[in-house]
Design a protein with these regions (language model features):
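Histidine-/acidic-rich catalytic cores in large beta-rich domains
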Residues: 1-172
Length: 172
């Protein structure tokens, strides 16, 4: 995922990824750096991870998109400047769950969280908690139950919907 340039020469992006044996596209932490390379903001406290043979640590588990408050698209738009030194951040994350209503297999569940400048999670919206609202008919639910797009990571996990993007809504 490419980093995003913010006003004033600030850059936001991932500092690295979790080992692929244990996670699929799990960003370790989302950081913002200034022009001189100093970290001015960091988020990594979504999930506490203890992978075998690795250091126990907190991770963002951020696979794809993120948006800083003020700019819903992530690139320059006149009058919609992201807030480089303040504001909330919307982050697409995922976590490993067991939900027998969706599948009898382990699942990689996508979610959206909003984090304040201090790294506090203000709210979370998880796909698995709203699965019945997505409008899948019984045939589609049956397919997802039997094969939720299994991946080798994490001992076999179903990447059942694989969300890539989310965004703040701009002015209507």
């Amino acid at each position: 995922l490419p980093p995003k340039l913010l006003p004033g020469g600030y850059v936001m992006g991932l500092s690295g990824y979790r080992h692929p044996d244990y996670g699929m596209q799990d960003g370790v932490n989302l950081i913002e750096i200034d022009y001189d390379g100093n970290i001015v903001w960091e988020f990594d406290n979504f999930e506490n991870i203890d992978d075998p043979g690795r250091d126990h640590r907190w991770m963002a588990r951020q696979p794809h998109n993120y948006q800083r408050e003020g700019n819903p698209v992530g690139s320059y738009v006149p009058g919609m400047d992201a807030k480089p030194l303040s504001g909330n951040t919307l982050i697409l994350v995922h976590q490993t769950i067991h939900n027998p209503k969706i599948s009898d297999k382990k699942l990689l569940d996508d979610a959206m969280i909003e984090v304040d400048w201090d790294g506090n999670i203000l709210w979370k919206w998880s796909i698995s908690e709203h699965f019945d609202e997505l409008g899948f008919d019984e045939a589609a639910k049956n397919v997802l139950f039997r094969d939720p797009n299994l991946r080798a990571s994490d001992g076999g996990v179903g990447d059942y919907l694989h969300v890539n993007c989310m965004s703040y809504l701009g002015p209507n």
